[in-house]
Swiss-Prot record:
Name of the protein in its database record: LL-diaminopimelate aminotransferase
Entry superkingdom: Bacteria
Names of the cofactor(s): pyridoxal 5'-phosphate
HAMAP family to which the protein is assigned, alphabetical: DapL_aminotrans_1
Protein family membership: Belongs to the class-I pyridoxal-phosphate-dependent aminotransferase family. LL-diaminopimelate aminotransferase subfamily.
N6-(pyridoxal phosphate)lysine, modified sites: 249
Assembly: Homodimer.
Pfam families hit by this protein: Aminotran_1_2
Keyword Transferase: yes
InterPro entries: Aminotransferase_I/II_large (IPR004839), DapL/ALD1 (IPR019942), PyrdxlP-dep_Trfase (IPR015424), PyrdxlP-dep_Trfase_major (IPR015421), PyrdxlP-dep_Trfase_small (IPR015422)
EC number: 2.6.1.83
Keywords for the protein's UniProt record, in alphabetical order: Aminotransferase, Pyridoxal phosphate, Transferase
Species this protein is from: Gloeothece citriformis (strain PCC 7424) (Cyanothece sp. (strain PCC 7424))
Length: 411
């Protein structure tokens, strides 16, 4: 009989969001009259920017003409999109990133998991706590961890607590680690990192031969000009960091699928024989073998983000969600709840009241206000006693959800 990858058996009972869906569906079946508002999973609600839609329509028409039809594209992405990204997202901010170092993909969630393909199994891996669950689960699947303990922490991972005491920015690890996951603006806490914060991490990585996986999926929500949008704004980061970005949240591409990963050509890691190998070459080989590239139509839509019209429309989308976040923060604070994040980020991190556990507060919010959020404990042990609320929803839903919370849960 064929055998399985036993590492999958080490995964906890259910991925966070399917468990939320199970509970919500059970409640909806028992209470069909309830009008449930979902502020849990970070999925966008507003339509694609008009500039992107028009570009995609034009691309569809091109696919219907033999003279302009496109078949397989380059696995790394079309150069015209990579150039626009390099110029607008990196070089404009003083980052020394070339278009050839940018790889277009169908999602940063995929890339943060797939990047492990090019790294060995004996690396020591550090994740923040709380953490986006994908970082942990993909390492479990890849065989980089032992079993989980009673708190849900996996043997072999180094957990870096993010708490109110450290402003939800982790301290440097006390031990040497090889791979470090950082996400700023942070999911789930909404915290941001200053240039000083990131400089400490870059210096640590260079001193220890570590690689930073920097998830910048929410950088478009930064409005404070003093905060870095990219880790490559920090001197030396080209030699120690891989950055992941996405069009999902700034341009509404969650259902369209387009993202990018930056692997500088100066970035190296060691082979088992001690020689240094360029990671760009390995990632390029991995993508060429396992990925056929993002649809031409979608890439034309992403390119339109960088047009004058596209930039204005994307900014309007981002501002819409940031205003939602402000409403959530203001209304929940009025209700007597302690809130973090929601500024320079689309997530609000709420301290659960009355000593309730994260899942107990989830159930209370669902049952009394018919509002769905995300239990903080689903993001790690340090998330217990917290709750994530997403600003990705319609204004009507955000205002109604916060009205219900004030009515039902005012502390």
């Amino acid at each position: 009989m064929a055998t399985i990858n036993d590492n999958y058996l080490k995964l906890k009972a259910g991925y966070l969001f399917p468990e939320i869906a199970r509970r919500v569906n059970a409640f909806a079946e028992a209470h069909p009259e309830a009008k449930i508002i979902k502020l849990g999973i970070g999925d966008v609600t507003e339509p694609l920017p008009q500039a992107c839609r028009q570009a995609m329509i034009k691309a569809v028409e091109e696919m219907g003409d033999r003279a302009t039809f496109k078949g397989y594209g380059p696995e790394q992405g079309y150069n015209w999109l990579r150039e626009k990204i390099a110029q607008n997202d990196f070089q404009a901010r003083g980052c020394d990133i070339d278009a050839s170092e940018i790889f277009i993909s169908d999602g940063s969630k995929c890339d943060t998991g797939n990047i492990l393909d090019i790294f060995g199994k004996n690396n020591t891996i550090a994740v923040t706590d709380p953490v986006y669950p994908v970082y942990v689960d993909t390492n479990v699947m890849a065989g980089h961890t032992g079993d989980a303990n009673d708190k849900g922490e996996y043997l072999g991972l180094v957990y870096l607590p993010m708490t109110a005491n450290n402003n939800f920015t982790p301290e440097l690890p006390s031990q040497k680690v090889d791979l470090i996951y950082l996400c700023f603006p942070n999911n789930p806490t909404g915290a941001t990192a200053t240039k000083e914060n990131l400089t400490k991490w870059v210096n640590y990585a260079k001193e220890n031969g570590s690689i930073i996986f920097f998830d910048a999926a929410y950088e478009a929500f930064i409005t404070d000009p003093s905060l870095p949008h990219s880790i490559y704004e920090i001197e030396g980061a080209r030699d120690c960091a891989i950055e992941f970005r996405s069009f999902s949240k700034n341009a509404g591409f969650t259902g369209t699928r387009c993202a990018l990963t930056v692997v500088p050509k100066t970035l190296k890691a060691k082979a088992s024989d001690g020689s240094e190998v360029e990671l760009w070459k390995l990632w390029n080989r991995r993508q060429s073998t396992k990925f056929n590239g993002v649809s031409y139509i979608v890439q034309r839509g992403a390119e339109a983000v960088y047009s004058e019209e596209g930039q204005a429309q994307v900014k309007a989308l981002v501002n819409f969600y940031l205003e939602n976040a402000k409403i959530i923060c203001d209304k929940l604070s009025f209700a007597g709840l302690t809130v973090y994040g929601g500024v320079n980020a689309p997530y609000v991190w709420v301290k659960t009241p009355d000593g309730l556990s994260s899942w107990d507060f989830f159930d209370k919010l669902l049952q009394s206000a018919n509002v769905v959020g995300t239990p903080g404990s689903g993001f790690g042990a340090a998330g217990e006693g917290y709750f994530r609320i997403s600003a990705f929803n319609s204004r009507e839903n955000v205002e109604e959800a916060t009205r219900r919370i004030i009515e039902k849960l005012t502390v």
